[in-house]
Regions:
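Residue-level preference for short coil/turn positions at secondary-structure junctions
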Residues: 43, 94-95, 130, 142
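Non-DNA-binding regulatory cores of transcription-related proteins
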Residues: 95-100, 105-133
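Active-site-proximal alpha-helix that buttresses catalytic centers in soluble enzyme cores
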Residues: 2-83, 109, 120-122, 128-132
Length: 157
């Protein structure tokens, strides 16, 4: 099973847009990352995001670029800084296929650490904030590894 964790793309400031939709740059970042994941055949059964507009937009634009519109959903549990990762880990354990989560850096870092080394505080990956960085974890049960990570500044075009 694969789990791709995506730190949201560039968003507008509160002054530019109180709801903080993603910017034009963010739209390009999300399209590029979605196309890249599609090119390697990644087609998650669900694309989760938080209640924040910029994570919703990131997930929606990426899903469209992957040809997977309609597979996005707000996580049924909070996925913000400091929130428990146990509900996400339980969803992964019960999933029938691959998953993707577009979220916030603290939560994603702790989820990756919990999967790979069963310790949320032991950092196993790093995200470049706000730029659509993706990290792919592959495994099952208590055996997970990081298989790749992409940053926008590493992506072609």
């Amino acid at each position: 099973m694969k789990v791709v964790l995506v730190h949201h793309v560039n968003a507008l400031t509160k002054e530019q847009d109180p709801q903080r939709h993603i910017s034009e740059l963010g739209q390009a970042q999300a399209k590029r990352l979605g196309a890249r994941l599609k090119a390697i055949g990644f087609a998650p059964e669900r694309i989760l995001h938080s209640e924040a507009q910029w994570t919703t937009d990131t997930a929606t634009v990426m899903a469209a670029a992957m040809g997977l519109a309609g597979r996005t959903a707000q996580a049924a549990y909070p996925i913000n800084t400091g929130d428990a990762v146990a509900p996400f880990l339980a969803e992964i354990a019960e999933a029938k296929g691959d998953l993707m989560m577009c979220g916030h850096v603290d939560y994603l870092l702790r989820a990756a650490s919990a999967l790979v080394c069963n310790d949320e505080q032991r950092k196993v990956v790093e995200f470049k904030p706000g730029n659509g960085t993706a990290v792919c974890l592959e495994g099952a049960g208590s055996e997970w590894v990081v298989t790749f990570a992409w940053r926008q500044d590493h992506a072609p075009g």
